[in-house]
Amino acid sequence: MAFTLEDIVQRFGGEVVGNGSQRVGSLAPLDQAGPDQLAFLANPKYLSQVETTRAGAVLINAEDLARLASRESRNFIVTPNPYAYFARVAQTFIDLAAPKAVPGVHPSATIDPSAQIAASAVIGPHVTVEAGAVIGENVRLDANVVIGRGTRIGADSHLYPNVAVYYGCKLGERVIVHAGAVIGSDGFGFAPDFVGEGDARTGSWVKIPQVGGVSIAADVEIGANTTIDRGAMADTIIEECVKIDNLVQIGHNCKVGAYTVIAGCAGIAGSTTIGRHCMIGGAVGIAGHVTLADYVIVTAKSGVSKSLLKPGMYTSAFPAVNHADWNKSAALLRNIDKLRDRIKALENAAAGRQDGPAANAASSSAGDKA
């Protein structure tokens, strides 16, 4: 299905510059788009591509439009945030093109008689819904999803294949959980019960029952193979509109504030609180029992071992450098204690010279005057 630029502006706002009757039916990058496609400019360093693109129209902000050398024979939709505008238009195109799922329960699904399934829900092959679970309106559970006893899934949510949501968890409306994610598995809680030292040490680790749940608010998206552990006593909490990438681990009793984004392979240890509107980069490690303020940014591969109580950007990762340069830096790092001692010795020697003959002469002169 194709839309005119005027149709798009009526739905999403913005201003058409050029031919409002131009029709577009899909989206593409600036350097690949054709005459029936819509492209966007989110980064001004690609401005030159706007002047050579074959796109039927380009989403652009007013500042970048003013910088163009020529607008001749080109069509634009002017909007303050072309990237977000692109995302909304793309979602509309995808929704219209996607086949409509038919409500109902697949014959191979296993549904406990006490579970409540909305008539508009789509329950796929080999899904399991345990006792007391509640599945809301327009929920879609794809193949092999498992919903534990007493768990509630809010309206318009979509759980992709092989998602497991353990017992007693709550997912709000419009939650998306991608394939293989696990919500509500046991938190990593073990009490040490050892006596003795060395080879004479005896005892074991005692598992601490994890009797809390996981509470996920509306409009959260969770990536493939991510795990969110249930709380030890209270719930692990994910607030509204949090976006979590693939392969993220969130430990028990964590709280992730609204509108925070967490990139892939990050690991967040238990009882950590992350504020609102934070950005956690890929492969970041956050220790347990720490707090991050609102609007904190932690760059990729950083390690956070203590609370970050002021907004801002934090980095502890070492950026990649030429291998030979890294070896030189590593050699210096190994000898840093020796270098420190040499500097301290030089400082002491310099201080001794200052306290030496000149200082003694001044003292003697003062004594003579007395």
Swiss-Prot record:
Residue numbers annotated as active site: 252
Highest taxon in the source lineage: Bacteria
Database matches in Gene3D superfamilies: Hexapeptide repeat proteins (2.160.10.10), MurE/MurF, N-terminal domain (3.40.1390.10)
Protein's GO biological process: lipid A biosynthetic process
An example molecular function term from Gene Ontology annotations: N-acyltransferase activity
EC number: 2.3.1.191
Low complexity composition-biased segments: 358-370
Keywords of this entry: Acyltransferase, Lipid A biosynthesis, Lipid biosynthesis, Lipid metabolism, Repeat, Transferase
A Gene Ontology cellular-component term: membrane
Catalytic activity: a UDP-3-O-[(3R)-3-hydroxyacyl]-alpha-D-glucosamine + a (3R)-hydroxyacyl-[ACP] = a UDP-2-N,3-O-bis[(3R)-3-hydroxyacyl]-alpha-D-glucosamine + holo-[ACP] + H(+)
KW Repeat (keyword) present: yes
UniProt-annotated stretches for the region Disordered: 350-370
Listed pathway(s): Bacterial outer membrane biogenesis; LPS lipid A biosynthesis
Family: Belongs to the transferase hexapeptide repeat family. LpxD subfamily.
Subunit structure: Homotrimer.
Function per UniProt: Catalyzes the N-acylation of UDP-3-O-acylglucosamine using 3-hydroxyacyl-ACP as the acyl donor. Is involved in the biosynthesis of lipid A, a phosphorylated glycolipid that anchors the lipopolysaccharide to the outer membrane of the cell.
Protein name: UDP-3-O-acylglucosamine N-acyltransferase
Gene designation per UniProt: lpxD
